[in-house]
Amino acid sequence: MGKIFYIMGKSASGKDRIYSLLVENKELNLKKLILYTTRPIRAGEEEGVQYYFTDDRRLQAFEAAGKLIEARAYHTVHGIWTYFTADDGQVDLSEGNYLGIGTLESYEKLKAYYGAEYVIPIYIQVEDGERLQLSLIHISEPTRLA
């Protein structure tokens, strides 16, 4: 049986960069666990690559079908944006290993759903001063950290 390696860490800890490097390493043969979001797609993003972009109706359909694994809602100036993981058939642990990225809360829900023996946590810890510096670079030069 395969595993789900799940990357977590505070904002600006480098999670996305580490995720990208691991996915790009063909020797690891990791499949991507792609989350859903109700927020609008951003410039440079592609449907089914970073996220599946959807709406509240689909979120509710997953929930009604008992296929909603976890969901997190964020109150933004543009409204409520929800990020969620659903059992949509993309994960088949008999077919290999997966790589996901999220929060500690979403990790706990995935672990409860798939089982602790199948969900392996990877926590990225970076000193707060360095995270601040990375955040400032990201704001002023978004392509520099890519």
Protein language model regions, located:
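Walker A/P-loop
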Residues: 16
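Conserved phosphate-donor/acceptor-positioning beta-strand/loop module used by diverse small-molecule
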Residues: 99-103, 114-135
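ATP-dependent small-molecule kinase phosphotransfer cores
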Residues: 37-98, 102-104
